[in-house]
Amino acid sequence: MLYVNGDSHTAGAEATNQHAFAEDDPNLEMLGRLPHPDNVKVSWGKKLSELIKYSFFCDAESAASNTRIIRTTKDWIENTKTPYDELLVIIGWSTWEREEWLIDSEYYQFGASGIDDVPDSHKDKYKEFVSNVDWKQKTYEAYENIKKLHNWLENLKIKHIFFNCNNNFKKIKEKDRMNWGYNYISPYTDNGTYDAYLDSNGYDKVTHNSWHYGADAHAAWARFLLKYIVEKKIITTRNSSGLKFNRI
C-alpha cells in the first residue's frame, strides 16, 4: 500500500481539472474538500503507485497545514488494516506557517495570505495571526513536529519518505540539523523541493497565476521518486505481486 499525504501538490490540484476541491464541481459537491478525482488520477502519488504496482490511498487536501497532515496520517495508520511492513508513506510538506484551528467541531486550515475565509468568531484572531507570523519560529516548529512524526513512524518500522513542496529547512542551524538518512529528500536546500525540481526541469505551472503543475509534471515527479526509491534500496526485488520493500 502506498499512502500519500500533503497539500494541493499531493492532491494534484488543477493537474487536469480546474477544480482543486471536489465540492467546487457542481456534480461532486457531496465530496466536500476531497481532491477532485480527475486530478487524483494523474497525481504523482497515483502514478507512482502504478509504477510500483501497489494499492493507493491519498489523504491530501489542498491548502492543508502540516498539523493536518500529521494528524490525518497518524489517524489513518492507527486505523488501517494494512500490515505496517507492507506500507510505504510519502508526504509532501506544506508551507511552514499554515495552521489548523478547531472551530465548533470543524477543522479549518489557515495560511498567512490574509485572504482565507474565516468564521466571524475568529476573524480578529486570524488578522493577528497574519500580522504576527514569525517565520523563524514557524520553521523550527514545523521541523520539530516533522521529527516527531518521523520518530513515531520509525518506532512502528514503517517505511516513509518526506519531501518539501515549497519551503525548505536551510534556516535550521547546523547544530540543530539531524541526519534523516533516506527518509527526507534534501530537506536543507533550495533546489531540493518539489517545485524547484519541476521548475529546473522545464515544467510550467498550469496558468501564469497558479502555484500548481500539470499532469506531465506529476508524472515526472513520480519517476523521480521511483528512481530515488530504487537507488536507496527501499524497493529491491520484484515478484509476481510487484515490487517488494526491503526491510531495514
Give short role names for the model-derived ranges:
Residues 1-68, 214, 220:
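Serine-esterase "nucleophile elbow" of acetyl-processing enzymes
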Residues 71:
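Residue- and microsegment-level detector for short, conserved "hotspots"
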